[in-house]
């Protein structure tokens, strides 16, 4: 019987050198391990990541309280349960915590246990994790959303918007799409060098040069795509699609430069201009009409519902509008957004909600209502590749897991290459069909 015999947590370090939680789950015949990521720009509605707060140790970012919660309260409750009963395990975790935002035991404690149990369950059944979670129809490799140029909270430069990304959707296999992404990344590096700009990389592996404007950033990415020999879409195409091989995606992380007191979007790092919600929506409409943009994540602030509705009405039929801080992988907030008819896609970050079951519920709710799902990493990552498995398990069709550098990002891409090889002729790369615009 796959009975949980031991649950052990420890404090390890993430890709930014900050502590995070790693959990091991044992049964008599299987083992599972999971490490928990953390974000830099976090939404106020996310589940609570429990930190120790002792400034003398890891600058207050230690996670020994969360580790202790796993090794005592959670371990005592889970030992003796069947590791293959994922929903029951996650229900137990939620009951043990007893708060709506996981602030008692910590979402980082709960998530580590939840994912480690899934890993142990998959090993017990002899199935790869994507098959264990998704069943026999799990065969879709995701279109990568590659963060090649950084600004905002991810970089010390004069660019307000956090992420400028490429999406190589015009290919027939994940491996070919990944190759194109890597070639464009190196093309961009050479282009930056030729202009005397920095090629240092940010938390997610993208470049963070000191540019004059947000416009210069997107124009550099478009130029790099062309220099790599690939066709980028035209803004006259629907969403920049047409016969394009590569499209542009943005994550401005608008909550980071929204002044709630003024009710203005303040471009603090570049022009210093201040925009109302209406003006911000019009700004994005101009960009969509000018550049080959297929996806905008967090184009408006997390609680600016009016702004989100304006943006959705203006460009939602042409562009994927992804809610990250808006929805925080939370089915309740997603349902609210669906009822308000805002956005058309949800970013899925497992640590925003805290358990695998709740993550899958959010993905299913999105699918039932015609919203796409983008499985995502965090800026503070580990070598754990579970999100790659989840992307295939759910046939989500899109993954956001950084640029073409830093081994914590490459771990996910390499895992997807292995899965594609394992699936063989069953592997499906959705390409432009990943978008519903």
From Swiss-Prot:
Q: Which superkingdom is the protein from?
A: Bacteria
Cofactor-binding details, from the entry: Binds a second Mg(2+) ion via substrate during catalysis.
Q: Which HAMAP family match?
A: Enolase (MF_00318)
Question: Which processes are annotated in GO (biological process)?
Answer: glycolytic process
**So where does Mg(2+) get bound?**
251, 297, 324
Q: What class of enzyme is it?
A: lyase
Protein purpose: Catalyzes the reversible conversion of 2-phosphoglycerate (2-PG) into phosphoenolpyruvate (PEP). It is essential for the degradation of carbohydrates via glycolysis.
Under catalytic activity, the entry for this protein gives: (2R)-2-phosphoglycerate = phosphoenolpyruvate + H2O
For this entry, the protein name equals Enolase
| Matching InterPro entries | Enolase, Enolase-like_C_sf, Enolase-like_N, Enolase_C, Enolase_CS, Enolase_N
Q: In which pathway does it act?
A: Carbohydrate degradation; glycolysis; pyruvate from D-glyceraldehyde 3-phosphate: step 4/5
Compartmental location: Cytoplasm; Secreted; Cell surface
Regarding protein family, the annotation reads: Belongs to the enolase family.
EC number(s) per UniProt?
A: 4.2.1.11
Answer whether the UniProt record assigns the keyword Lyase to this protein: yes
Q: Which gene encodes it?
A: eno
The UniProt keywords, alphabetically, are: Cytoplasm, Glycolysis, Lyase, Magnesium, Metal-binding, Secreted
Residues reported to bind (2R)-2-phosphoglycerate? 162, 349, 378-379, 400
The species this protein belongs to is Chlorobium chlorochromatii (strain CaD3)
Mention one GO molecular function: magnesium ion binding
Q: What cofactors does this protein use?
A: Mg(2+)
Q: Which Pfam families match?
A: Enolase_C, Enolase_N
Matching CDD domains: enolase (cd03313)
> Which residues does the Swiss-Prot or TrEMBL record annotate as the active site?
204 (proton donor), 349 (proton acceptor)
Q: Which SMART domains match?
A: Enolase_C, Enolase_N
